Amino acid sequence: RGLGDVYKRQENELFKKFDVKRGLRNEDGTGVLVGLTKIGNVVGYERIPGGGLKPIPGKLFYRGYDLEDLAHAILKEKRFGFEEVAYLLLSGRLPDREELASFRELINDNMPLEQKTKMNIIELEGNNIMNILARSVLEMYRFDPNADDTSRDNLMRQSIDLISKFPTIIAYAFNMLRHATHGRSLHIRHPQENLSLAENFLYMLKKDYTELDARTLDLLLVLQAEHGGGNNSTFTVRVTSSTGTDTYSAIAAGIGSLKGPLHGGANIQVTDMFHHLQENIRDWTNVDEIDTYFTRMLNNCLLYTSPSPRDGL
C-alpha cells in the first residue's frame, strides 16, 4: 500500500509537470478543446475577469436551441419529441409537420432487422447487451452496399439507419438474455408503423406499457440525444472516424467506450439506485422529499459545475 502511494504521488507530479490532461480536462477544470461544433454545446461555468471560473446553472444547447425549452414544449403539448430532436440535430433546423411525418415514416421503415442479424442476436453467447449491440452494429456493415462511403449524404443515411435499428437490437437482445438467463419465454415482436420510436422500443421490449412509460422514455431520449462530443464515447468516435474508417466501426468503438464502468457503464448501477431509493424515501406522496433525493443523487455530472439542465426535467 505504501509503495502504491509513492507511485501515485510520482504519477501526479509527472502529470502536472508535463501538463497531461486527465479526462480531457485542464488543471483548472475546463474542458480540453478538441474540435468545434454547432451541433451541441455544454455550458457549466463562466470565466471571471482576471482569472478563475464561476459555476453557473448548467445549460445544454442543441443546434442553438436551449434543451430546456425544447423539452418543456414537448411536455406541454403532450407529444413524442425524440424524432423531432433527431431531425434537428441531423439537419440543423426543426422540421415542419410534413417533414416530421416523413422522417418518422423513414425511422419506422428502417427499424426491422435483417433476418440474419435477428437470428445472430438470438444465438449469440454472452450476457452483456452492450457487447451484443456492438457486434450487431459491426454486422450491419455486411448488408450495406456503400458501407465505406464517407460522403455526407451516405453518412446521413447510415446515421438514420442506426438510430432506427438501435431500439430493435437492444429490445431483442434483452429478451434473448432474459430467456437464456432466467428461462423466460422468448418473444420477438416486430416494430409497429403507427408508434413513435419510444413506444416501439417498449412494445418490442415488453408489449404492455403505459403512456407514462412511453412519454418518460421519450423525454429521456431527448435529454440524451446529444452532448457536444466531448465525453469519452463521442470522443472515441471522433478519434476513430478521423482515420477515415467506416461508420459502423466508429460507432462500435464508441459503444465499447460507453460500456465502461467509468462512463455509460455506470448506468448498470441504476438498479441499485432504485433499491436505495426505496430504502430512503419514506413518503412517496411527498414531492419535496423525492425532489431532494434526486437532486442530491443526480448533481454529480463532471461536465457541469452546477446542476445539470437534465436534473429538473
Which ranges hold each PLM region?
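Single conserved hydrophobic/aromatic residue that forms the stacking wall/gate
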Residues: R1-Y7, Y304-L313
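An N-terminal structural lobe/cap that precedes and organizes the functional/catalytic core
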Residues: Q10-K118
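Short, hydrophobic/aliphatic alpha-helical segments
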Residues: L67-E83, R215-D218, G230-S257
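Glycine-rich, mobile lid/loop segments that gate access to catalytic sites or pores
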Residues: I121, E125-G228
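A structural-propensity feature for long, helix-poor, extended segments
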Residues: W284-S306
